[in-house]
From Swiss-Prot:
Protein name according to UniProt: 3-methyl-2-oxobutanoate hydroxymethyltransferase 2
Purpose: Catalyzes the reversible reaction in which hydroxymethyl group from 5,10-methylenetetrahydrofolate is transferred onto alpha-ketoisovalerate to form ketopantoate.
Subunit relationships: Homodecamer; pentamer of dimers.
Required cofactor(s): Mg(2+)
EC number(s) stated in the UniProt entry for this protein: 2.1.2.11
One Pfam family of this chain: Pantoate_transf
Chain sites annotated for binding 3-methyl-2-oxobutanoate: D45, S46, D84, K112
Active site: E181 (proton acceptor)
NCBIfam families: panB (TIGR00222), PRK00311.1 (NF001452)
Binding site for Mg(2+): D45, D84, E114
Keyword Disulfide bond among record annotations: no
Length: 266
């Protein structure tokens, strides 16, 4: 497929065409995802759980991330590579610049950080230095201990109002994209309409500009044997991984995934 850039993603939002994203951690799956038409490969710190076997993303290092970004780059064929800055790798200006340099030099096209409006300054800092930033809002796994577990965020009106305001503030600070995780579908739709930048959802309904899932989840692979409510097993009834990936792309583009059963209400 032709190279996907930030301009491509902005154009897809403007045209109302859904953006497809999956996590990806190695060259073989990068190639396979590209063959299926996946537009964004997220090298997520979720690798700490699905590859390394940890119970959270917190142990993942910048070196771990750089290793997997470089692997994905070698197998990539046109997708935009989005990479997570891991836990506490952007706590200070010096850390943010050093960590970002490592991941961009390894092959990332955009970096993702987790939080809310307090990230406005890091977003500005990185944007001014040529690093596009996606901000992950809602359920932010790096702060799971503060949130008290993996829970839906933005269910009460004050939280929802704050999340809408934060999204607008982050866009004004220069964020290139937002990712909403485990947010009520109606709130996610409102935020998507309120900003001009692309908004990707996971457990956030089907009115966002695109969707993302963890690769292992959508292939029915789980260490715990359980899947989150927002996951669909695309391997079910398929005879190949390629067919499962293609089905995911087709269903996201057709807005048949996610269905109402995969979302959350306020």
């Amino acid at each position: 497929m032709p190279d996907i850039t930030l301009t491509t993603l902005q154009s897809l939002k403007q045209k109302g065409e859904k953006i497809t994203m999956l996590t990806c951690y190695d060259a073989t799956f990068a190639h396979t995802c590209c063959e299926a038409g996946v537009e964004v490969l997220l090298v997520g710190d979720s690798l700490g759980m699905v590859l390394q076997g940890h119970d959270s993303t917190l142990p993942v290092s910048t070196a771990d991330m750089a290793y997997h970004v470089a692997a994905v780059k070698r197998g990539n064929n046109g997708a935009l590579i989005l990479a997570d800055l891991p836990f506490m790798s952007y706590a200070t200006t010096e850390q943010a610049l050093s960590s970002s340099a490592q991941l961009m030099q390894a092959g990332a096209h955009m970096l993702k950080i987790e939080g809310a409006a307090w990230l406005a300054e890091p977003v500005r800092l990185l944007n001014e230095r040529g690093v596009p930033v996606c901000v992950h809002m809602g359920l932010t796994p790096q702060t799971v201990n503060v949130l008290g577990g993996y829970k839906v965020q933005g269910r009460n009106e004050s939280q929802a109002r704050q999340m809408r305001a934060d999204a607008i503030a982050l866009e004004q600070a220069g964020a290139a994209m937002l990712l909403l995780e485990c947010v009520p579908s109606e709130l996610a739709a409102e935020i998507t309409q309120a900003v001009k930048i692309p908004v990707i959802g996971i457990g956030a309904g089907n009115a966002t500009d695109g969707q993302v899932l963890v690769l292992h989840d959508m292939l029915g692979l789980s260490l715990s044997g359980r899947s989150p409510k927002f996951v669909k097993n695309f391997m079910a009834g398929k005879d190949s991984i390629q067919a499962a990936l293609s089905a995911y792309v087709e269903e996201v583009k057709a807005v048949t995934f996610p269905g109402a059963e995969h979302g959350f209400s306020a």
